[in-house]
């Protein structure tokens, strides 16, 4: 059992929403789209080493490395065209 928590949503609902958005934007070409949209999954843990372990687990599935941003923050991202999929580790004192 891990000491970290990965805050993610319902996979099927998320994918259905992406398909719905794609269909809507395709059917409505006058609707503006964001230049650099992103999706983020947060990793929570009380200490930096455990947070890093959670990040490594999530980043492995994406096939990307974890970047140590300093001060307890970690980042892993994969780009899909202009869209970023991020996993972010945030220190406990900065979580809201």
Q: What are the residue ranges of the model-derived segments?
A:
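Short glycine-rich, basic-tinged beta-strand/loop micro-motifs
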Residues: 31-52
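C-terminal edge-of-domain segments
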Residues: 70-96
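Short interaction-hotspot residues at assembly and binding interfaces
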Residues: 2, 37-44, 73-77
């Amino acid at each position: 059992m891990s000491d970290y928590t990965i805050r993610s949503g319902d996979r099927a609902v998320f994918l259905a929403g992406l398909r719905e958005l794609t269909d809507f934007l395709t059917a409505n070409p006058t609707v503006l789209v964001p230049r650099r949209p992103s999706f983020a999954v947060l990793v929570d843990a009380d200490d930096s080493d455990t947070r890093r372990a959670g990040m490594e687990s999530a980043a492995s599935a994406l096939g990307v490395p974890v970047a140590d941003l300093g001060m307890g923050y970690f980042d892993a991202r994969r780009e899909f065209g202009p869209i970023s999929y991020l996993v972010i580790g945030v220190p406990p004192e900065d979580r809201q």
